[in-house]
Amino acid sequence: MAAVPLRPCRASGRFLPLLRGGARSRGASPWAAGPGRVAQRRYKKDVLPEPGGAAPAVSVTEIRRYLRAQGIPFQDGYSCLHAPSLFGPELPPAAGPPFTLFIDKTTGSFLCTATLAEGGWQDLQAAVELRHRGVPAPGPDEGEREEEEEAEARRAREDARRIWERALPLGELLDEEETRATKAAFGIAPLADGTLKRFGVRYLRAAKALVFPWFAPRDAALRGLKLLVAEQRGDAVSYTEETLPRFDAYRNLFGLPLIGRRDAEVVLTGSELDALALHQATGVPCLALPRGATILPPALLPYLEQFRRVTLWLGDDLRSWEASKLFARKLNPKRCSLVQPGDLQPRPLEALNRGLNLTKILRAALPAGHKAIVSFRQLREEVFGELANSEQVAGVKWARFPELNKLLKGHRRGELTVFTGPTGSGKTTFISEYALDLCTQGVCTLWGSFEINNIRLAKIMLTQFATRRLEDQLELYDEWADRFEDLPLYFMTFHGQQNIKTVLDTMQHAVYMYDITHVVVDNLQFMMGHEQLSADRLAAQDFIVGAFRKFATDNTCHITLVIHPRKEDDEKELQTASIFGSAKASQEADNVLILQDRKLTTGPGKRYLQVSKNRFDGDVGVFPLEFSKASLTFSSYGKSKAKLKKVKEEKGPSPKKGPSGGVGGSSKP
């Protein structure tokens, strides 16, 4: 039985109506909310950097130098430096494991696995200073967490405990027939009851959901849950999941309590069911990442330090494969192997259902570290994978802009897109919907809005997300804000002129911390400011465009760069040459998009999106956009189908419409 992969955009609390106690309040559980619980409104989207300024950069050399200067012993690990804990009583060396403090080599952030104390590099320095003065460092519960945050965490733990007590092990259901029917519904018929019991999996009848526990590694206390609901779609099973606490605070490495201290090998999977199937078939230690192929939180790296070999088997599509390569960078590629998706190498649960040899698939995993020079023999399988999965190679498809899919084919990592349009044409409004479309499909997005502030941008995006004017329906605000908050969306707090190095450092930090794969910079001129002379300004712009191009390539991250056009005659259509500055921007770009306003003469106020450059396969063309003021959307989402016109990429006058105003001929360069 085939399985449809999970999508990172979760439907918060909407699939468990039987367990709701009323309308969902902010921070309250949708399963155990009782009557009389006061609704709280809180909108808080992640922003980068912290309000105090850019994230402080620290190198591993500086960290080592500081530890030596303070007389703190340490060992070099794969992703972290290991040191004795500073957050408990000083113990003699033989009293327990001495190195329980893990310091991230990239960011300097730390986690003490003995006390669960965590923080940034500056917090660690402060703890060292307190230690030298004889003052105990604050424990994990004595930090400066917001009162509302603490209350929300307590509610989540209490709600998780209630659900856990109501759930039953599958082996304790009424009869074998109910157990078989439940397993069949989730596509896990081959999984033995013993495997499910070993991992602590339970079943919640009221919601028809599997329950996966999150136990604290220190004291085995229940910290949260993940609930999984299955839906039959033909021969396939589609899964929807929900977590307590909410998704961005859920850091459960499912299967961690079963890992022994001497285990030196582990397989990371994209779902709990895959971990169960793989462990049953091979006996190899397996862990499921809490957010699948979407993100590997750096806070989990300390728990993976003990393993000399890490195999990533995250799924059966190209996005999982790309995520595996990205995660291997964090984990240290030298110890990582990757299972490449293919017909004979599907996700572990499907492989078990099909009777494939999972041990053989693991042995065929490819090393993540590449040499500087390779032969075609080493690339052969990857080339075949791209040919066999051409639709996935084309990238993530837009749901709101199907016409854009016909031209660009999809949104791909590692590319640079330049977007321009006349002043006042709605560039920010369009590009926010363009990016939101991808974000709702699990593309981790970082916004750098240098022209308008984040509150105004978030208001635009929330309106587009809800496709309605929330000003007139404030009673729906909490519901839509809850859903919007679950998106993998982050904002830089910069506004106006900024130094390019500071911006790039923040982007690099976001890629590492949140596995960002799409960065939107709106816009280049506002980021640069107006201080330089005209000649210096053009050179500075070329340098910045080149820096963004290099960043996109080095980090396998797509950058969408909004640039104002030159001042030209309003009656003329914009062209690729209309982009402000030298030709550097259009030369470096993989894609050039132009928002045309009233230029293709089908009526006043009409706008068109023109693809004037497409390096992926050369298709260029134009299609109309219709703006809805109520929902602030340009897409044909729920509207009549827009007409697409493909054109040849050549110099000369713009294509003219046919006699009927319909679609003209199409051709490919």
Curated annotation (Swiss-Prot):
InterPro entries documented for this protein: DNA_helicase_DnaB-like_C, P-loop_NTPase, TOPRIM_DnaG/twinkle, Twinkle-like
Membrane topology: Peripheral membrane protein
Protein name per Swiss-Prot or TrEMBL: Twinkle mtDNA helicase
Keyword ATP-binding attributed: yes
Domain notes: N-terminus enhances protein stability and hexamer formation, which is important for DNA binding, and is required for DNA helicase activity and, ultimately, for mtDNA replisome processivity.
Catalytic activity: ATP + H2O = ADP + phosphate + H(+); Couples ATP hydrolysis with the unwinding of duplex DNA at the replication fork by translocating in the 5'-3' direction. This creates two antiparallel DNA single strands (ssDNA). The leading ssDNA polymer is the template for DNA polymerase III holoenzyme which synthesizes a continuous strand
Coiled coil feature spans: 141-167
Transit peptide, from-to: 1-43
EC primary class: isomerase
GO MF annotation, one: ATP hydrolysis activity
Regions of compositional bias (Acidic residues) in chain numbering: 141-151
Start-end of Gly residues biased regions: 659-669
Lineage: Eukaryota, Metazoa, Chordata, Craniata, Vertebrata
Subunit structure: Homohexamer (via C-terminus), which assembles in a ring-like structure. Homoheptamer, which assembles in a ring-like structure. Homooctamer, which assembles in a ring-like structure. Oligomers may sequentially eject two monomers (octamer>heptamer>hexamer) upon DNA binding. Oligomerization is Mg(2+), nucleotide and DNA-independent, however, Mg(2+) and nucleotide stabilize the homohexameric form.
Region entry Required for hexamers formation and DNA helicase activity, spans: 120-378
Record region (Disordered): 133-154, 638-669
EC number, UniProt record: 5.6.2.3
Region (N-terminal region (NTR)): 54-214
Sequence ranges assigned to domain SF4 helicase in this UniProt record: 390-641
Annotated localization: Mitochondrion matrix, Mitochondrion nucleoid; Mitochondrion inner membrane
Pfam families: AAA_25
Function recorded in the entry: Mitochondrial helicase involved in mtDNA replication and repair. Might have a role in mtDNA repair. Has DNA strand separation activity needed to form a processive replication fork for leading strand synthesis which is catalyzed by the formation of a replisome complex with POLG and mtSDB. Preferentially unwinds DNA substrates with pre-existing 5'-and 3'- single-stranded tails but is also active on a 5'- flap substrate. Can dissociate the invading strand of immobile or mobile D-loop DNA structures irrespective of the single strand polarity of the third strand.
Native species: Gallus gallus (Chicken)
Stretches the record annotates as Contributes to single strand DNA binding activity: 2-120
Keywords from the UniProt entry: ATP-binding, Coiled coil, DNA replication, Helicase, Hydrolase, Isomerase, Lipid-binding, Membrane, Mitochondrion, Mitochondrion inner membrane, Mitochondrion nucleoid, Nucleotide-binding, Transit peptide
